Design a protein with these regions (language model features):
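Membrane helix-loop-helix hairpins that form the core translocation module of multi-pass transporters
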Residues: 37-91
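Generic transmembrane alpha-helix signature in multi-pass membrane proteins
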Residues: 9-12, 21-28, 114-119, 126-136
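Transmembrane helix exit motif
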Residues: 79-101, 189-199
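Juxtamembrane helix-boundary/capping and inter-helix hinge elements in multi-pass membrane proteins
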Residues: 26-37, 105-108, 134-140, 171-174
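Small-residue-enriched transmembrane helix starts and helix-helix packing motifs
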Residues: 1-14, 90-91, 97-117
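Transmembrane-helix boundary and interhelical-loop signature of multi-pass inner-membrane proteins
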Residues: 32-33, 53-76, 155-200
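Structural signature of hydrophobic alpha-helical transmembrane segments
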Residues: 3-20, 69-79, 143-155
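Juxtamembrane transmembrane-helix termini in multi-pass membrane transport proteins
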Residues: 3-53
């Protein structure tokens, strides 16, 4: 249960489905509610698949390139802290999808895989976190994947009601949510960085 909770709390703030809402609404503006729901569902299923591939195949990727797991955690921590500062800084560019990519996506028949699933919901930060997760037992591995599914379920619900949430929260509410998610992501990034440094240089913690 602890593994499930840790996976959910860590990933949810990094995935940050609230940040995906504006792009989702822009790209599905002309769709009916049923089609919008199908797009959100497909994107969340793709997200679980992407994170699962990163989780199960990550160690093989690290071994192939000769990368130490702690080095990956340091890189992931820096990446998360950078993303967090973008969310916390007023007026900073918070778009995960550039204007050119956004314009191109408007003409695509299916936007669920890209740009929604990747990079909006499962970007480099979330994939780095999944690769860095070490689960020694099959039960822990299963709980981790279940955690991915719970994050996807939460993201699906948020995207499904994104139009109503945007109307209720308004711009001030959305900005507040971005700062809350940014603060949590910053704390997670610092924790990843500090834990990796402590593992590489145990003498520093004495």
């Amino acid at each position: 249960m602890e593994v499930l909770l840790a996976t959910f709390t860590t990933l949810f703030s990094i995935v940050n489905p609230f940040g995906a809402m504006p792009v989702f609404l822009t790209l599905t503006a002309e769709d009916r509610a049923a089609e919008r729901a199908r797009t959100a569902l497909r994107a969340c299923v793709y997200m679980v698949a992407i994170l699962s591939v990163a989780f199960f195949g990550g160690q093989y990727i690290l071994n192939f390139f000769g990368i130490n797991i702690q080095h990956l955690r340091i890189a992931g921590g820096i990446l998360l802290m950078r993303s967090a500062f973008e969310l916390l800084t007023p007026g900073a560019n918070r778009d995960r999808v550039g204007p050119d990519a956004l314009e191109e996506s408007k003409h695509k028949d299916d936007i669920s895989f890209t740009p929604l699933a990747m990079p909006m919901l499962s970007g480099p930060g979330s994939m780095a976190i999944c690769i860095g997760l070490i689960r020694p037992t099959y039960v822990d591995k299963a709980m981790t994947v279940f955690g991915f599914a719970l994050v996807a379920l939460a993201a699906f619900i948020i995207l499904l009601f994104s139009l109503r949430l945007t109307r209720v929260l308004g711009k001030p509410g959305m900005a507040a949510m971005a700062r809350i998610m940014g603060f949590i992501t910053l704390a997670i990034g610092v924790n990843f960085f500090a834990t990796a440094i402590a593992a590489l240089f145990p003498g520093l913690t004495r």
